[in-house]
Amino acid sequence: MATLKHLGSKNADYGAAEQYLLFEHDEFTMKPVLDENGRLIPREDYRLSTLNCGGEDFAVACMRSNLRYEKNQRREDVKSHHYIISFDPRDGPDNGLTVDRAQALGEQFCKEHFPGHQALVCTHPDGHNHSGNIHVHIVINSLRIEEVPFLPYMDRPADTKAGCKHRCTDAALRYFKSEVMEMCHREGLYQIDLLNGSKNRVTDREYWAQKKGQAALDRKSVV
């Protein structure tokens, strides 16, 4: 069952997003995990691509565009949007989903739904609980650098203009979820109804409570 999650960030350090994607982080604190010498630990397996960055580093490209349009200069501005598409762990063995295939799907999703935005697309082979759920991170600069067609989730003319910003409204998020469902149907992958929920669905708060409880039990068993 593929899921879609959205996070908005006011962090002006665009390099932090790429650091998270490339290096190991603690799943509870979200801080980098360091080795015995205090160095960052690279993730063992991932796929990473940039879109609309003109051959530049994602962070540099975003900062250049922000300065050009005089946007994202205030502390309270949302600088980037982070979307995560997580696939069902069974999609690998049952439906032939690979990291490369998921990366291609993520890039296509980004191009179709976030045109005109500088973006990072990165696929990891595993989730927080090591259950094998391949997932794709899509990080976009909130600023749009090119004029784009009026897409179904947009509700005002400014949503198409270069120099204006992406807005993840409730209606937009519902649309993106419906598109994830359509993608899974088209690709023959497992899917649940993301719009109406599931009686077996676990909320983020419940998931992390369970994870922290299990981690505490694991520590006790080692002592």
Task: Name what the model sees in each region.
Residues 1-223:
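N-terminal nicking endonuclease/strand-transfer module with a His-rich metal-binding environment
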